[in-house]
Amino acid sequence: MFIATSCSNGSSSKDYQEESDFSQTASGKNDSNGFVYIKGGTVSKRVGKEGCPFYNASETPVTIESFYIAETETTYKKWLEVYEWATSDERGEEKYTLNKGYQGNYEDKNYGTPLMPVTFLSWRDAIVWCNAASEMDKLEPVYLISKTDNTPVRQAETSTVTSGFGKAENAYVDKSANGYRLPTEAEWEYAARGGNPYIESWNYDYSGINNIEELVDYAVCIVSNLKNKLTNTAEVKSKKPNYAGLYDMSGNVWEWCYDEYSSTERIFRGGGWIYPANFCTVDYRGYADNLKNSSDDAVKIIDLDQVYGKSSAVGFRVVRNANK
C-alpha cells in the first residue's frame, strides 16, 4: 500500500538567517566515487508539520552526524553490476537472493537506458543490495543477522514473514560499519534541503528550487513531463542539482529510507516521474506496505506490487557514515 502525506514548511526563511558555524558549509564536496559529503549539524528551528523529522526541533533539537550520500539515485547499471556479482553460483553459501529490478520504468531491457534509476525493488531488496555492494567493495556490511552474529543479511525474502532474526526488516544495524546503507528519513530531508539550515534553500518547497515555473529544470515529474513530453523515468543527472550537489531529490523516482512508518510500512521520499509536483516537495512523505498484503485500492500507487512494495516509480540512493 502506498500513501503520501504532506509535511509542509511551517517556518519562514528569516528564522534561519543567523550567524552560525554552518556559514558556507562544506556540504556539497564531491568525491571521485560519486558521493557528496554532507556536513552534520544540529537543527534547532521547527520546519515541517507534525510527523516530519524536524517538527519538534525547537523543543528538541535534532543532531545529524556528517555522512556521505550518493549524488544520484542508484542506476540500473550499478544495481545490475552488484546483482550479478552477488547472485553468482560461485559464491556458494554466501550467494545473495534479491529481485533483479527494472531499468527505469521498463521491465523490457530493450527500452530505457542503464543510466536510469533502478526500480521495481522492495525495501528488502534495497537493504540486501546495500550489503552486497559493501561486500563487493570490501567494506563492512551494515545489516547483520544479529548483534552476536555478524553474518550479513543476504536474503530479500518474498514472503510476508515479519519476525525472526536474520530477516531484512529485523536485521541488526551496525551503526559503526563503513558500508552502504539507506539514509534515515532525517538524513534524507536534511540533504534534500541542501545540508545547511542557515541557507535560503533550506526553506524551498523543492530540492534546489522554490519556483514551480522553474521546476522543469530540477525535477522529473508531471510538470516537466507535460513540458518535455516525457513518459518515463529519466537518466540520472538529467536535471540540475540542489545546493549540496545532489540530483533528483525531487522527482524521477521515490527513494526508500530506512525508517518505519509502522511495524509493516517503510518510508520513501522525493516523489516520482508519474506524480504531480506537489508530491515531489522536500516535505512529502510516502510509505508502502512492503511486508503484508492490502486490499485498499484507494491509495494504491500505480503498478505497485501490494505484497512487496515494488513500483516502477520507486528506487533508492545510498549513504555511508563519515569519519568511519
Please tell me what each predicted stretch does.
Residues 166-175, 216-250:
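Short, well-ordered junction/capping motifs at the entry into regular secondary structure
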Residues 45-66, 230-238, 278-304:
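Short, polar loop/linker segments at the starts of domains and inter-domain junctions
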Residues 21-39, 44, 171-172, 177-180:
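GGW-centered surface loops in extracellular recognition modules
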Residues 50-51, 63-209, 262, 320-324:
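Active-site microenvironments of metalloenzymes and redox enzymes
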Residues 197-234, 265-270:
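Chymotrypsin/trypsin-fold serine protease catalytic domain
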Residues 240-242, 261-324:
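Disulfide-stabilized, aromatic/cysteine-rich ligand-recognition loop
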Residues 251-259:
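Active-site-proximal beta-strands of protease catalytic cores
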Residues 2-34:
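Bacterial Sec-dependent N-terminal signal peptides
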